[in-house]
Amino acid sequence: PRPVAYTTDAQTIERGRYLYASRSCSYCHGAQGTGREFVNDGKGTRIVGPNITPAGVVARYPPEDWNSVIRHGVKPNGRPLLVMPSEDYNRFTNEDLNVLVPYVRQFPPKEGAQAVNDLPHPAWVLYGLGAIPDAASRIDHQLAPSRPTAAGVTLANGQYVANMCIACHGADLSGGMIPGAPPDWPAAADIRPGTHSAGTA
């Protein structure tokens, strides 16, 4: 696996801060990396993103483990992560991965949440049968990372940023049932220009 560089200059940390916020890392792991409950439907489905400060699950990650977890959805022990949108992050450029990880590593060590993946029994059965795939099974692990694109309002940069939307909203952003989600989850919205469909944005 490709290791991640540990660079800590101010420009790196600032770019990492931007990516952490704009690529939805904080939605699952919290603004300070201490973990966050982001799904609780009151009917048996509860999902908590783990603490990723130096006091959490990533404390002993060597550089290559960050690449495996973020880009490939694979734990250091080789097992797939059940809830980690690595198909979104698989196309990260090396440059962006190399600024995101140092930003996360500079969080102050704090006590926080452990990962929770509470799903109804039927969902576990479907997962066991392969009907609900994890991210690792949906990724082309041989695909090279994206090449850097210049920041700005351009088609190339928009396509790169939209990689973060495809996993839920589909390759054409038309929405529909979210791949790998339990059957009773709401559909993702159609977010194509000029459309206003119901669904989860």
Language-model features and meaning:
Residues 13, 78, 83-85, 102, ...:
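Interaction-mediating elements
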Residues 16, 22-31, 66, 100, ...:
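The canonical Cys-X-X-Cys-His
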Residues 6, 32-67, 80-93, 122-130, ...:
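Gly/Gly-Pro-rich "capping" loops immediately C-terminal to redox-active cysteine motifs
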Residues 11, 15, 51, 61, ...:
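Extracytoplasmic/secreted proteins, especially bacterial periplasmic and envelope-associated proteins
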Residues 34, 76-81, 106-116, 149-153, ...:
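Inter-heme linker and motif-flanking segments adjacent to c-type heme-binding CXXCH motifs
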Residues 2-21, 131-162:
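Electrostatic cytochrome c docking/interface patches
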